[in-house]
């Protein structure tokens, strides 16, 4: 077995919730550390995230100390992480060998710049760059279709962050990890060399299967469940509007929302404004395990109303429980959701609500699509398969 030394830079990780990139580096590190040496570079909040996800026992950590700077607010803390990570890359010594793998877990500067610097200092090492979503056009905002609010300012900052990093990755990275076929077009030269790998994401199939064996036929308490970050791209505000349409047809319909994020206060206000307090339950962020699995098991459908997205692991975790998914017809979903989902024209909130109501009223159709969803996940969405993809390409 070829042995590698992995250096994973994940200084952008923060908060209780997990982004897709966070989930990928954590699950990779867990499995890689069984046979490989793994060092994860994070700051204190990222370390706490890893610890909550059960990663702390199996890898080595290098923790950036930015506690002093974080007293001055998010922006100063953010900048401090960038400069501290750069300085760390300047002074750190690693083995200058092709068996040394530097993995930048995101395109954010505190992950990509130290990886770039180490690649310059130690040219024999191999840089694997994570690029799991290309920022939207700042003039279009977070949408691929009709949307009342596009969150253009947030989109601009996201675009600006990626602007200097993409050329560095194109020129210096040895491999790029993306999570759908469309993203490969961002790195055509590397793709022609076979160095762009599509990592579709995965779910913890083994844990879910074990839970389902022990907890069969739980009562359906919730009609629909949503899981995801309360972020502009995820459509959480519009989901409340959708649910208002649903309850006009099914007055007692219940929606469970798992997640947290910058739009939480707006979500709560929208629920109050539309008087949906009895129809929507907010759980906040729920960690992996029996509580979250119970919510999925007690639900009939999962919705993923993102207006701009490159994947959808959060919804696919629920699909592993046999829940059919409903989402907007985004371009990335052609490869990410080949089955088990009903797609709606982007921005058609009434149409989205109609599909929810139709599936809730048609158990046979709901169960059929749910079986397709579960089959797709069980056959193709194992983390062990994703790690095998990575190690196979590294051996080339």
Predicted feature locations:
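N-terminal subdomain of nucleotide-sugar transferases
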Residues: 1-53, 57
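A conserved mid-protein helix/loop that constitutes part of the nucleotide-sugar donor-binding site
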Residues: 20-23, 27, 226-245, 262-268
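Membrane-proximal helix-turn-helix segments that form the acceptor-binding/catalytic region
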Residues: 117-121, 134-137, 149-176
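Carbohydrate-associated surface elements
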Residues: 182, 202
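Nucleotide-activated donor-binding/catalytic signature segment of Leloir-type glycosyltransferases, i.e.
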Residues: 268-286
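Aromatic "clamp/platform" in nucleotide-sugar-dependent glycosyltransferases that forms part
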Residues: 307
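Short hydrophobic beta-strand element within catalytic cores of glycosyltransferases
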Residues: 324-327
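Conserved acidic donor-binding segment of nucleotide-sugar-dependent glycosyltransferases
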Residues: 341-350, 358-363
